[in-house]
Amino acid sequence: RAWLDSFYPTLMENGRTAGKTWGIPFQRSTIVMYYNKDAFREAGLDPDKPPATWYELVEAGKKLTASDGSKWGMMIPSTGYPYWMFGALTMQNDQVLMSGSGDQTYFDASGAVDALQFWKDLGSKHKVMPEGTIEWGTLRQNFLEGKTAIMWHSTGNLTTVKNNAKFDFGVAMLPSNKRRGTPTGGGNF
């Protein structure tokens, strides 16, 4: 019992159902915001104050985006684990996607619809992110090559970014809209 109690309770939640433990956390991670501090300085932004809200994210993104499309303010991947990114956006919009019992979904709730619209608008309306598909597998390289100043990605990338970034970078919590939030990823044994 002491061994099970040594895990973070929040990470144990998705391995439990009906009061029983069916799985234990393995290779867990969360989505974080990696940002290029040098790019922030060049854009006149404080490199020690990453965007804390959706509004600040859009405003910083506008300053960080090159008009010729050679550099984007931000990128959120839409392949690989798009449900994970969508889950982060809905959490930030104070919207759960499923009932606690797991028998009802809320994809059509206004908080979910608005979160999806915000994600789409980052490219189509605000022009701070490319429209269309953003590949999970190549996003990290885009960040390391300076093609985006901000990327949302897994904590699992920290070592690679740390070992390969040729610029000063920071890692921050994802911004909030109605609240802060990021779902855990990874798997269970």
Set out the residue ranges of the language-model regions.
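Glycine-centered hinge/linker elements that transmit conformational signals in sensory
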Residues: 58-63, 102-132, 174
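Extracytoplasmic "Venus flytrap"/periplasmic binding protein-like
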Residues: 1-10, 14-16, 42-44, 49-52, ...
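Hinge/lid segment of periplasmic solute-binding proteins
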Residues: 1-32, 58, 85, 170-172
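Ligand-binding "clamshell"
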Residues: 18, 70, 92, 161-177
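A local structural motif
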Residues: 44-50, 102-104, 120-133, 147, ...
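Short, solvent-exposed loop/beta-turn-alpha elements that line the ligand-binding surface or hinge
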Residues: 1-7, 50, 73, 95-116, ...
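Beta->alpha turn/N-cap motifs
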Residues: 136, 153-158, 175, 187
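Hydrophobic residues within well-ordered alpha-helices
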Residues: 57, 64, 87, 141-146, ...
